[in-house]
Structure formats: C-alpha cells, structure tokens
Regions:
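Structural motif
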Residues: 22, 43-45, 96-99, 120-122, ...
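A short, small-residue-rich loop immediately preceding and capping a beta-strand
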Residues: 90-127
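A glycine/threonine-rich phosphate-anchoring loop and its flanking beta-alpha core
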Residues: 116-208
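Active-site segments that bind and position negatively charged phosphate/pyrophosphate groups
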Residues: 200-315
Length: 375
C-alpha cells in the first residue's frame, strides 16, 4: 500500500491525484491496440474471457503488424490463486506487457499480475460496468468470492483504451451497473473531504479530483436515463458516450483521488450474503450509496434524487432488489460488522459508525426504498 505523505507529527500534507498515463476513448479503437502497445514491447499477454476473445480478436488481428500475442482465458475470480496461475504463464511466455480485456475482475487481475511481475499494463474495458479500469487498485476476493483485501498499487495503468463500438454492444444491465458504481463517487469523495481522510493514492483530495467527482454525478443525472434508453436499442448516442466516460474515467479518477467511504464498505459487507453474489458490483454499490446517505442523515431532496434515479434506470433501492427475499436480522448485522471492519473504508466517514448504527441505516434505506417504489 502506498504510504501517506506526512509531516513530522504524522499529519498528511500533500494533495495527490492519480490517473492513467493515457486514456483513449473512441469508436473502432480495438484495431489500434497493438500499435498503442508497441511502445512497451512486441510480446503481448492478453487476459480475457472466452467470449471476449471471440469479440475482439478479429479487430486486434486486423490491426496487428508484428506483435506476438499470447491469450489466456480468465477463470472468473480476482483471487490470489488466479493471479499466481497467470503470473506463471506470463513468466514462461516472456511477455513484455499485460493487457486485460473485459470487465472489472479481469482488469483487477491484470493490474495485480503486472504489479507482481513488474510489467506495464494496458486496460481495455469491453463493458462500462465499473470504475476499475483507471485505478491503481485491485480488489482481491477469496476463491469463493468473498471480499478479502484491497491491493493498493504504486501507479495507475499505463494506458486505458475504450472502444465504444464494443462497449455499446454489451448488455444494458452492465452499463446500468457502471452508473451504480459511479453514483457513489461524489458522495464518498464528499465524505472523505468532510472527515479529512486520505484518498487511495496516499494524499488528500485535490480540487481537480473533487470537481471530477461532482462532474461524474452531474453527468449521470443529465445523461443516465437517455443513455439507458439508447443502450437498450443498441444505439451509441452522445449520452451513451458521456456515460461511458463518466463510468470509466470520471468515476475512476474521482473515487481513487477523492477516496472511498461508506458505500463501498457496505458493498463489501454484502458479499457475506450468498444471495447477493449474482448481483453486479455497481448494483450493490448503488444500494450502499443510499445506505450511506441515510447514515449521514442527508437531506430528503438528495435522498429522493438518488432513489428516483436508481428506480428509473433499474438499480436496486431495497434489500429485495439485491436478491434478498427473506431479510434475516442476524445476516444484516453480519453485513454491518463486516462493513465496519478496521481495514475497510467505513472509517473514512465523517462520523463514528458502529455496526449497530449501520444495521439501522441498512434497514432504514430498505424501508425508504420500499416506501417510494411500492406506493
């Protein structure tokens, strides 16, 4: 984990913003991948899914001049078992650069492999479902899919490349999930600012990062519904392009350089309930955002704007929406205890949060969600 910049009394002094060396977004960019990667070397290791390879390989091959490509199929979980398996393949292949093509767990795994093998990494999202691509962070789970730890990396990816033609062809639920993840960015950055917490790159939030987090939220409010409607029809409008940038870049820089707080800690707590494992990351984070607002005693207008937005685009605002058909108090309390773990980000909230407080906020958020969506 990157050390915080501190003075002699242990107070964090520097404001730090982290970002990829280069961010590229446009239509048909997959054909240019090998030429972009050429600056790092000719031997490219590409981690993707079996279906992802079928979608991207023709375009990559069409644009490839003289690079040597080694593909490997991701096993589905960003865990140390998978990371170590891939490290062995990379070392045996003599690869120069790690390229992760796919979704959030492929990105996190690729970044971890690049870190442990000391190689550059290029992240290529084929979906806009999380803000993982731009961050210097990998979220590590157990083999069974339960949150284990954050792996804080010394730098952001060397390059992030988004081919919007490919992203627009993904199921719309993935774009919506990305909006759920991005929804938390501003509120968590605001909480960290209020509590004077450090961000994920070991410093304080810069003006630029806070404004990117605010722009992320504003972009969702202004474009989210239009983007969802267009994406359902497979149409890549300007609203869809804007949301892809918000989900990927604005949220990525905003969360990492603004900081994480309650919403993501709550997401991590919910991994303890098996029924939620079928939900996407951003869907759980969206409900975590609502819980965080209840925990903060946010204004009714703000809470209602979030509930209305989530309801309109299809993000969960109730426990039932997370797949929990039977709410068991002991399970919710376990979620609260896990979310309040000392090594998670609940400690960045501008108030002391005990598991009992969080339990009440979860149940309160569920009640609000049911009240406003079932009336």
């Amino acid at each position: 984990m990157m050390r915080n910049r501190v003075d002699m009394e242990g107070n964090i002094m520097a404001a730090i913003i982290g970002s990829p060396t280069r961010y590229i977004q446009g239509k048909g960019e997959m054909m240019n991948l090998c030429s972009y990667a050429d600056k790092f070397g000719k031997n490219l290791f590409i981690l993707t899914s079996a279906s992802g390879r079928k979608r991207v390989e023709p375009a990559i091959n069409e644009g490839n001049k003289d690079s040597n490509l080694v593909y490997d199929v991701f096993n589905g979980e960003c865990c140390m078992t998978e990371i170590n398996r891939i490290i062995k393949i990379v070392e045996e292949a003599g690869s120069d650069v790690i390229i992760g093509i796919g979704g959030g767990k492929i990105h996190d795994t690729s970044k971890a492999v690049a870190y442990y093998t000391k190689k550059p990494v290029i992240i290529v999202p084929t979906i806009a479902s999380t803000d993982a691509p731009c961050s210097a962070l990998s979220v590590i789970y157990t083999d069974e899919g339960v949150f284990e730890k954050y792996l804080f990396l010394p730098s952001s990816p060397d390059m992030v490349m988004v081919d919007t033609d490919i992203v627009c062809k993904a199921p719309v639920r993935l774009l919506i999930s990305g909006m759920g993840d991005a929804l938390a960015t501003y509120f968590e950055a605001r909480a960290c600012k209020r509590s004077d917490a450090s961000n994920c790159v070991g410093g304080k939030c810069t003006l630029a990062a806070m404004n990117l987090a605010q722009l992320c939220y504003d972009t969702l409010m202004e474009n989210g519904v239009q983007a969802m409607i267009a994406a359902k029809e497979g149409i890549c409008t300007k609203a869809v392009e804007n949301v892809i940038e918000a989900n990927t870049y604005l949220s990525g820089i905003g969360f990492e350089s603004g900081g994480l707080a309650g919403a993501h800690a709550i997401h991590n707590g919910f991994t303890a309930i098996p029924e939620t494992h079928k939900m996407y990351h951003g869907e759980k984070v969206a409900f975590g955002t609502l819980v965080q607002l209840v925990l903060e005693d946010a204004g009714e207008d703000e809470i209602m704007e979030v509930i209305d937005f989530c309801s309109e685009i299809g993000l969960p605002v109730t426990l039932k929406g997370l797949g929990i058909e039977e709410v068991k108090p002991e399970q919710i309390m376990e979620v609260a205890r896990l979310a309040c773990a000392p090594d998670d980000t609940m400690g960045n909230m501008p108030l002391d949060v005990q598991p009992e407080d969080l339990y009440a906020a979860i149940m309160g958020a569920d009640a609000l969600g049911r009240y406003y969506t079932e009336e």
